[in-house]
């Protein structure tokens, strides 16, 4: 999906900011971003969603699966309180402590643009109902999500708990 490519460019910018200031921060960002990306990629692969217009056709999908995709997209976009917000929050704290507010403002604004597209995609998944479904050869209900995909989804959704645990340790 092209959206994943554009999102990767945005995340690359955040990783470069983290890399310039703190090596551990960069590795933390990369690890969490990889976890979230793998979660989304596995879901898209399980349901054979390779193009943007195919995502609109998942109206026939189980509402729980649609909700998981929605939450994972918001997490990947960096919306609080999901796990995807944690690395950005750490970079924000680091840049604020180093008084690099100009670059921080630009990064946050660009992230809001990316988050807008994730919200638009999520809205399309829930609200639009496309009945024409010529690209699928199998019934979407017959496809099962792998246990690994489910585990990754719940980890990315449970970001608030991980953030709280992170601050309790510090």
Curated annotation (Swiss-Prot):
It holds the Pfam family NADH_dehy_S2_C. Keywords: Electron transport, Membrane, Mitochondrion, Mitochondrion inner membrane, NAD, Respiratory chain, Translocase, Transmembrane, Transmembrane helix, Transport, Ubiquinone. GO terms for biological process: mitochondrial electron transport, NADH to ubiquinone. The chain crosses the membrane at residues 24-44, 67-87, 101-121, 150-170. Its EC number is 7.1.1.2. It is a multi-pass membrane protein. It comes from the Eukaryota. Core subunit of the mitochondrial membrane respiratory chain NADH dehydrogenase (Complex I) that is believed to belong to the minimal assembly required for catalysis. Complex I functions in the transfer of electrons from NADH to the respiratory chain. The immediate electron acceptor for the enzyme is believed to be ubiquinone. Belongs to the complex I subunit 2 family. This is NADH-ubiquinone oxidoreductase chain 2. The gene is ND2.
């Amino acid at each position: 999906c092209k959206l994943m490519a554009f999102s990767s460019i945005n995340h690359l910018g955040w990783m470069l900011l983290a890399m310039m200031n703190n090596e551990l921060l960069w590795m933390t960002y990369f690890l969490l971003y990889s976890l979230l990306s793998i979660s989304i990629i596995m879901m898209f692969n399980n349901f054979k969603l390779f193009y943007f217009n195919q995502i609109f056709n998942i109206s026939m999908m189980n509402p729980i699966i649609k909700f998981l995709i929605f939450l994972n997209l918001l997490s990947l976009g960096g919306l609080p309180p999901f796990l995807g917000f944690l690395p950005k929050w750490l970079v924000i704290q680091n840049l604020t402590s180093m008084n690099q507010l100009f670059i921080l403002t630009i990064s946050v604004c660009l992230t809001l643009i990316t988050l807008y597209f994730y919200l638009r995609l999520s809205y399309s998944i829930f609200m639009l109902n496309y009945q024409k479904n010529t690209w699928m050869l199998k019934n979407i209900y017959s496809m099962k999500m792998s246990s690994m995909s489910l585990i990754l989804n719940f980890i990315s959704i449970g970001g608030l708990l991980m953030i709280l645990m992170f601050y309790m340790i510090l």
